[in-house]
Amino acid sequence: MKQPKWQRRSEDRPREICAAALDVFAEKGFAAAKLDEIARRAGVSKGTLYLYFKDKEQLFRAVVRDSIAPNVAAITSAISAMEAPFADVVRMFLAGFAEREARLPVGAVAKMVIGESRNFPELARVWHDEVASKAIGALAAAIERAQQRGEVRDGDPRLFAFSLMGPMVLGALWRATLVPAGGQPLDLPALAKQHAETVLQGLLR
């Protein structure tokens, strides 16, 4: 006998709730996001949502860990495993950021974290621990290895990593914040490509 849909898919519920929460957080921000709406979009009751997540902050942490952090991990793992010249690592990293930002509302979630971190400091801690520090750390480690090989000029690897990431984060925030308000559209993959060539001129020996 065929099982009811709710029984067959019970293992998918946390993932579906997180996917719905990601959309609602990106659209409305953390404070304005309502668990009732998240549950409705996920196709579950609010009571069911509470079986998996005790509050909105725990749900946000799960969203970051399940939806965004794996993409960061994929890029950072690729960087760590690459034995290619540093220039190729930079091009891959920046292109990968642009490609994933096109699929996930990274800029919108980052905007939310920035805007609401004073009232909800846990958001900033989660974003720092699961996303920002890992991306910067992996990039800084790649830069340090390239310095040891003589590819990259002397300097603080972590500061170089911030120089590489800064324009991409600004681009993601621009698309999430200013384009919906009438700002000029931004081609993030084109920015990634041009920025890579520009910054490599200053980094490479």
Where would I find each of the regions flagged by the language model?
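Amphipathic, non-transmembrane alpha-helical scaffold segments
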Residues: 10, 18, 64, 124-136, ...
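Alpha-helical DNA-contacting segments of helix-turn-helix folds
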Residues: 61-67
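Short coil/turn segments at alpha/beta junctions that flank glycine-rich nucleotide-binding fingerprints
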Residues: 27-31, 82, 149
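Hydrophobic/aromatic-rich alpha-helical bundle segments in the mid-to-C-terminal region
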Residues: 125, 133, 147-197
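C-terminal alpha-helix
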Residues: 142, 198-205
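Short secondary-structure transition hinges
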Residues: 73, 99-141, 182-185
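Hydrophobic alpha-helical connector segments
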Residues: 62, 76-110, 158-164
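Basic, helix-initiating cap at the start of DNA-binding domains
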Residues: 1-44, 51-58
